[in-house]
UniProtKB/Swiss-Prot annotation:
Keywords: Cell membrane, Membrane, Transmembrane, Transmembrane helix. Found in functional membrane microdomains (FMM) that may be equivalent to eukaryotic membrane rafts. FMMs are highly dynamic and increase in number as cells age. Flotillins are thought to be important factors in membrane fluidity. The keyword Transmembrane applies. Belongs to the flotillin-like FloA family. It comes from Bacteroides fragilis (strain ATCC 25285 / DSM 2151 / CCUG 4856 / JCM 11019 / LMG 10263 / NCTC 9343 / Onslow / VPI 2553 / EN-2). This is Flotillin-like protein FloA. Homooligomerizes. The chain crosses the membrane at residues 10-30. It is a single-pass membrane protein. The keyword Magnesium does not apply. It is found in: Cell membrane; Membrane raft. The lineage of its organism: Bacteria, Pseudomonadati, Bacteroidota, Bacteroidia, Bacteroidales. GO terms for cellular component: membrane raft; plasma membrane. Its main location: membrane.
């Protein structure tokens, strides 16, 4: 039995299998066949070179087929490969271009890739251009001129502005500007009743301010969904001011009382000092009388006259006192 032809046959079969595996790995034949059937002009060599460049054909070729079927013949394989190698999402870009074409929205390929590379979902942006998005704002608190606090909630309908998606502000900026406009509108109202009666006045005033300037969206409408009455901020501020004024008045009154007490104590000290001076002066009287007797300037009759005057003065003082007071001293001889 000849064994060599059998080994040769096995070797050829194994080699053929390995060749077919490598061929279908590096050259996606069925993908090429699908592209040919769809009318996309691409060769097996180009598919093989995609593998060499680490570009997956199963991403590029379906995108080319979708674009060709949608009538977007200006999209080339090289552009899709370049966008993939730049880190973009080929599927999103192709879907967005097809949707924009069907909706008659002008969206060049370069703009779509720029939006995608900027980190935004270009397909979602196109969908928002066709179907506007409704954004609910968080509760916005504002105070009218009469001091009543109002809590408002709004619904903002926006549409994506494709030309502003690169470099334009996002939803957070829209919400912040709308909240600022609501606060300004309520704050300029004379009273809270006028706001409750005409909530659409807030929407009209906010829309006139052009809050979507420099953003990636176009504001279509602003609707006030709900308005609640909060605290009476004006009354609370008046109460706080009254309490502050009361505390200030009490502090000033306490200061005046302390000054009055200090003045009273000072006057008492001065009175005690005056009494001490009087007592000291009275202590000098007997000495002066003795000196007058010795010098002959004061006679005995003058002395008795002085004593009588003192007795009369004491009697008058006792008469002027209430009943129960001390009796007058007897006249001295």
């Amino acid at each position: 039995m000849n064994v060599e032809p059998m080994y040769l046959t096995i070797f050829l079969i194994a080699g053929g299998i390995i060749f077919l595996v490598l061929f279908f790995h590096y050259v996606p034949f069925f993908l090429w066949l699908s592209a040919k059937v769809s009318g996309v002009n691409i060769s097996l060599v180009q598919l093989f070179l995609m593998r060499i460049r680490n570009v997956p054909p199963y991403i590029i070729v379906p995108g080319m087929i979708e674009a060709h079927k949608a009538g977007l013949s200006n999209i080339t394989r090289d552009e899709l490969e370049a966008h993939y190698l730049a880190g973009g999402h080929v599927e999103r870009v192709v879907h967005a271009l097809v949707s924009a074409s069907k909706a008659n929205i002008e969206l060049p390929f370069q703009m779509a890739t720029a939006i995608d590379l900027a980190g935004r979902d270009v397909f979602e942006a196109v969908q928002m251009s066709v179907n506007p998005k409704v954004i609910d704002t968080p509760p916005v608190t504002a105070v009218a001129k009469d001091g009543i606090q109002l809590i408002a909630k709004a619904r903002v309908t926006v549409r994506a502005n494709i030309r502003q998606l690169v470099g334009g502000a996002g939803e957070d900026t829209i919400l912040a500007r709308v909240g600022e406009g609501i606060v300004s509108s309520i704050g300029s109202s004379e009273n809270h009743k006028s706001v409750l009666e005409n909530p659409d006045s807030i929407s009209k005033l906010v829309l006139r301010k052009g809050l979507d300037a420099g953003t990636a969206f176009e504001i279509l409408s602003i609707d006030i969904a709900d308005i609640d009455i909060g605290k009476n901020i004006g009354a609370a501020l008046q109460i706080d001011q009254a309490n502050a004024d009361k505390n200030i008045a009490q502090a000033k009154a306490e200061e005046r009382r302390a000054m009055a007490v200090a003045t009273e104590q000072e006057m008492k000290a001065k009175a005690e000092e005056a009494r001490a001076n009087v007592i000291q002066a009275e202590a000098e009287v007997p000495k002066a009388m003795a000196e007058a007797f010795r010098s002959g300037n004061l006679g005995i009759m003058d002395y008795y006259k002085m004593k009588n005057i003192q007795a009369d003065t004491s009697m008058r003082e006792n008469i002027a006192k209430p009943i129960g007071g001390a009796t007058s001293k007897p006249l001295s001889d």
